[in-house]
């Protein structure tokens, strides 16, 4: 019997990275890319709230590698990742092969195992250059200007932040707060990101590390580069050394909080209070320093001793390169100090943005639920449009579910479901490849094998006692 069938067809919809109703983020769904959160996970160890991610969107304005449909920075389950597929594709367009690009990116984004294939963007060299070069040239020009302003920014930022936090507290109307955001906060916040980006561009470490490894071997190269602070301390070490000074009575509590109260393990997340906001934080930290057998300043001195020994060996073995390498080490050290100081002040500005969000929450009656709105949605609320507030309960629930999961793999290839991955008892914590091993961890090594190989965070099995830290604190 003949039958007539009606076949209905429709285009396959491209999955969206973000659902604004629920606050679910998953950029791994938008294409077959390789993502890494190395370095990112140190700066942002928490699942981000919508407010925090919208803050990072402002940073993206200072990044030249954005192509519609191919994000450079994405969010997977609330955590930020960098799209290595895009970076390697752009390197290929500039004539740099994939192996070289992998090597050059190791210091900043970590090592990608040789066994992992990095898919590239399906665009020709000409298309990539046409799409990216105009933005790259524009951003490069802006960064050259910013590099000349970094030191002035570092010098003036603390007073500006103190003034702005006080002004925010004195605002009593939505219209006034919107005006303050547009005239003062948003421009300076964008400038802070540009300063941080420009300081990062000044990083000369990668090439020097490669040259030192070739000349002196990995161990001595690490020793020579472990003392970049030299006689002048890196800003990233100041809070730790400062705690020791407070514990010994060499620094007042007030001075410590004024200088370092904006720094902490959660400084890039808007919803979490800064140390200076918690009256018990410093007491707890000082008590911990007194109990701890670890002395930060002694550890730094140990690094200096290791540096001196490695440098003497270098002088004996490579006398012709001593002067040039010494100059390069000095330049790298100066660059590192500038970069860390700029990052510290950018973190101080982020505290001001947190104060802005809290004030929005006060004026709108939202309290800390305000962090489940984006910065643009906060401005809408201040202007009388409260439509986004209906999404807050679902976004809060999504954030809670993401936060209950263990940290995701450092490297992700292809589509990744964080909940399915977390449910697998043999999941890998270093790598997820949807096209190969997926969530499954490798088998334990054969008996008698005592050497562990791999890279930081690599999967493997070894028996012993460890202290487990699920999150920074």
Model regions and ranges:
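Extracellular/luminal Protease-associated
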Residues: 1, 456-473
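Contiguous hydrophobic, helix-prone segments at protein termini
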Residues: 1-451, 455-456
């Amino acid at each position: 019997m003949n039958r007539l069938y009606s076949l209905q067809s429709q285009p396959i919809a491209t999955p969206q990275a973000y659902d604004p109703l629920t606050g679910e983020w998953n950029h791994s769904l938008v294409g077959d890319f390789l993502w890494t959160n190395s370095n990112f996970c140190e700066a942002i160890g928490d699942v981000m709230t919508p407010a925090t991610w919208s803050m990072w969107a402002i940073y993206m304005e200072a990044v030249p590698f954005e192509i519609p449909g191919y994000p450079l920075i994405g969010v997977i389950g609330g955590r930020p990742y960098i799209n290595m597929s895009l970076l390697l594709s752009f390197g290929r367009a500039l004539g740099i092969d994939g192996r070289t690009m992998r090597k050059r990116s190791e210091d900043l984004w970590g090592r990608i195992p040789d066994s992992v294939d990095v898919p590239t963007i399906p665009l020709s060299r000409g298309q990539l250059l046409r799409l990216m070069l105009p933005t790259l040239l524009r951003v490069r020009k802006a960064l050259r200007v910013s590099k000349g302003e970094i030191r002035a920014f570092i010098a003036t930022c603390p007073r500006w932040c103190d003034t702005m936090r006080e002004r925010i507290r004195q605002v009593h109307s939505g219209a006034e707060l919107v005006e303050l955001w547009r005239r003062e906060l948003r421009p300076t916040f964008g400038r802070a990101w540009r300063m941080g980006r420009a300081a990062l561009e000044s990083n000369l470490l990668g090439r020097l590390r490669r040259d030192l490894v070739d000349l002196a071997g990995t161990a001595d190269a690490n020793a020579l580069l472990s003392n970049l602070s030299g006689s002048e301390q890196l800003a990233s070490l100041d809070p730790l050394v400062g705690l020791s000074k407070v514990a010994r009575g060499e620094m007042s509590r007030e001075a410590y909080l004024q200088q370092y109260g904006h720094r902490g393990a959660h400084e890039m997340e808007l919803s979490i209070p800064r140390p200076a906001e918690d009256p018990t934080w410093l007491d707890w930290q000082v008590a911990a320093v007194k109990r701890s057998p670890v002395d930060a300043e002694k550890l730094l001195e140990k690094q200096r001793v290791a540096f001196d020994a490695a440098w003497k060996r270098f002088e004996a073995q490579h006398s012709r390169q001593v002067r040039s390498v010494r100059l390069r080490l000095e330049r790298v050290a100066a660059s590192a100090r500038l970069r860390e100081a700029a990052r510290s002040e950018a973190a101080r500005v982020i505290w001001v943005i947190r104060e802005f969000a809290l004030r929005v929450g006060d004026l709108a009656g939202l309290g800390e639920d305000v962090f489940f709105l984006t910065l643009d949605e906060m401005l809408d609320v201040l202007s009388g449009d409260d439509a986004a507030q209906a999404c807050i309960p679902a976004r809060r629930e999504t954030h809670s579910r993401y936060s209950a999961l263990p940290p995701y793999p450092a490297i992700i290839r292809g589509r990744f479901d964080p909940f399915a991955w977390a449910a697998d008892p043999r999941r890998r914590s270093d790598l997820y490849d949807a096209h190969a091993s997926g969530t499954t961890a490798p088998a334990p090594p054969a008996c008698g094998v005592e050497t562990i190989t791999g890279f930081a965070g690599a999967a493997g099995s070894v028996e012993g006692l460890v202290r487990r830290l699920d999150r920074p604190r």
